[in-house]
Design a protein with these regions (language model features):
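Conserved alpha/beta-domain cores
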Residues: 1-48, 52-58, 64-65, 69, ...
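Divalent-metal-activated hydrolytic enzyme cores
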Residues: 221-222
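Active-site loop ensemble at the mouth of alpha/beta enzyme cores that anchors a bound cofactor
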Residues: 235
Length: 235
C-alpha cells in the first residue's frame, strides 16, 4: 500500500492526488492534519450536496443547472479519505489524533496508548495502530528498543478501542542497501515474534522515498512517500 505523506502540502495537492487514485494520506503534525481533514470533509459534503441537487434537477427536467460545487474529474467527489498519523505523538494531541485519524503508526509508549484508547469516540471503529521500533538505535529517534515491543503489544491488546496492526520503523538514512535491508529485516523478524505470541498482525510500515526498494524486498506492506508524489517541500 502506498501512503502519500502530505505534511506541509495544502488541501489542493491532496485533491489532485485523490483525482489520480490515491486514497491514504499521512500527516506528521496533529493540528495541521486535522485542519486539512476538516477542510476536505466540508468540501466533500458540499460537493455531494451539489451533486444530489443536480441529479434531482435532471429528474425533474432535461435542464442541467451548473454548480461550482459539483464533482468532476478536476473537482473529485472526495469520498472518505483514509488518514494516517505518522509523527511523534504529544500527550496533549492524543484527543485530536484519536478523533480524526484512522491509523497511528508511531505509538511507542503505554501512556499514549491509554490516552488514545480513552479519547477514541464511541461508535467509531477501533483506531488502527502500529508500534514504532527504533531499529537503528538512534538516541534522538522515537520508538521502542527492539525487544520491548512485546510488552507494549500486550498492553495494546487489552485496550478495546485500539487495534494493533503491526510495526513501523524509520531507520537512520544510509545509501548502503545491505544495511537498509538488515534493519528492515529486523522489523520483520520482530513482527514474526509477536505473531508467535498470538498477535495477529498484517502491517509492516517501513520504507520511504530513498529506501523503499529495500523495504519492499524485506516485506513492507505499507511505504510512505511524500516528495516523489507532491514535489519538493518548501518548508
Amino acid at each position: 500500500m502506498l501512503l502519500a505523506v502530505s505534511k506541509t502540502f495544502p488541501p489542493g495537492h491532496i485533491e489532485a492526488a485523490y483525482a489520480a487514485g490515491q486514497r491514504a494520506f499521512g500527516e506528521n503534525h496533529a493540528q495541521e492534519g486535522v485542519e486539512k481533514i476538516t477542510v476536505l470533509a466540508a468540501l466533500a459534503l458540499e460537493r455531494r450536496v451539489a451533486q444530489g441537487r443536480q441529479e434531482n434537477s435532471r429528474t425533474r427536467s432535461d435542464a442541467i443547472i451548473p454548480s461550482a460545487g459539483v464533482a468532476s474529474p478536476e473537482r473529485p467527489l472526495l469520498l472518505p479519505l483514509e488518514w494516517h498519523f505518522i509523527g511523534p505523538i504529544q500527550s496533549n494531541k492524543t484527543r485530536l489524533i484519536a478523533e480524526h485519524f484512522q491509523w497511528v503508526h508511531s505509538l511507542d509508549r503505554e501512556k499514549i496508548a491509554q490516552r488514545l484508547n480513552a479519547a477514541r469516540p464511541d461508535g467509531t471503529p477501533p483506531l488502527n495502530v502500529c508500534i514504532q521500533v527504533n531499529v537503528s538505535g538512534e538516541a534522538a529517534k522515537s520508538g521502542v528498543t527492539p525487544g520491548e515491543e512485546a510488552k507494549l503489544a500486550d498492553v495494546i491488546a487489552r485496550l478495546p478501542r485500539l487495534k494493533l496492526r503491526g510495526l513501523m520503523a524509520i531507520p537512520e538514512p544510509t545509501t548502503d542497501v545491505t544495511l537498509q535491508r538488515r534493519r528492515f529485516a529486523l522489523l520483520r523478524e520482530l513482527k514474526d515474534r509477536l505473531a508467535a505470541r498470538g498477535h495477529a498482525l498484517d502491517t509492516l510500515s517501513m520504507g520511504m522515498s530513498d529506501d523503499l526498494e529495500a523495504a519492499i524486498m524485506e516485506g513492507a506492506t505499507m511505504v510512505r512517500v511524500g516528495s516523489a508524489i507532491f514535489g519538493p517541500r518548501t518548508k
